[in-house]
Amino acid sequence: MKRREFIKNTTLTLSLCPLLSACTSKNDKFYLEDDQLPKHVRLDICTLCQLDCPQCFMRLQEEEIQKLNGFGYVSFDTFKKFVDKHPYVKEIGVSNHGEIFLNPDLDEIIKYSYEKGIKLNAYSGVNLNTISETTAEYLVKYQFGDMVVSIDGASPETYAIYRRGGDFNKVLDNIKMINKYKKLYNSDKPRLIYKFIPFGHNEHEIEKAKEVAASLDMDIMFDVNYAPGYSPLKNPEKVKEQTRISNIDNNFSNFYDAYQNGEEWFFCTDLFKNPQINFNGELQGCCMCVTEHFGVNVFEVGLEKALKSVNVQYAKKMLSDFSVVEKPEIPCTGCQIYEFLKKRNKTVF
């Protein structure tokens, strides 16, 4: 099953020569001035994970990922070079496909980012089963930003159904450890967010989860189950009322309508406003890509050249004009979101 079936809702890689050729026209140069370059990027600093969640695309596609990209983490030296080479980047989302706390260089990454005035966040989520005392303190001392903790339950028994290999009580203990340092430093950072995906097996704990989150001084967010065939909801209307999830039926049109009404975020805009970079430097573009990429390595050529590469330019053309011929080397081709837009003739740009 492909990653495209597990689209994320946020509250929100390589022969280079032909891809780095000059832009064909002035209109194709999307970033002409420094202030037009993205100030926000997502750099997946670790794709390793100790859990075995049944519908995780990193598990369902593990063999393919291992063959094409492998699993790994961004070393501190690589992270430092990226930061130093891209002074216009002011915020980095460091979570995506794995668990950031399995990166042995995380403490250095957190500290250096703070020293360089770069905000870090983990909007894409952490499982928080593993964290050292030092890292917990660094998160607070060096002002790590928002951190979404994926829990999906309010008891050890329910948590373990989906977060296989995880320990609910250990996660709560780790949250308390971070809170201890927040109190010590009199800091409200990192803001910890309790993430709960309603399933048929856990929907009875929604109200209890709200109470647990409040007791831990956490905000709570509810996310859509993008694999509705797994543990489908028993009472979707009640869940919708309890969680206020507007797209409980997994309807992409809600996202597009919000974008059309002034919301800045839509899946496809991430390629240009908040590009996703894999741990090995491959430009993946957006959250829809796991094994797919744009055939250019950001660590090797830099972000600006990567975003001006032929494949990225062509992707924007495809998203601006559906008469443009689809090409297999462009990740948008075959994408569920792209097909949704094309079917309704709703261009993004």
Language-model segments: what does each one mean?
Residues 180-193, 219-221, 227-267, 282-283, ...:
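C-terminal accessory region of radical SAM enzymes
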Residues 269-271:
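Short, small/polar residue-rich loop motifs at catalytic or cofactor-binding pockets
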Residues 44, 87-95, 114, 119-123, ...:
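Conserved C-terminal portion of the radical SAM core fold
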Residues 26-146, 157, 161, 166-169, ...:
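Conserved alpha-helical substructure of the radical SAM core
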Residues 17, 43, 47-50, 262, ...:
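Processing junctions and N-termini across compartments
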Residues 5-25:
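N-terminal export signals
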Residues 48-50, 61-63, 99-100, 127-129, ...:
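Short, solvent-exposed loop/turn segments at secondary-structure junctions
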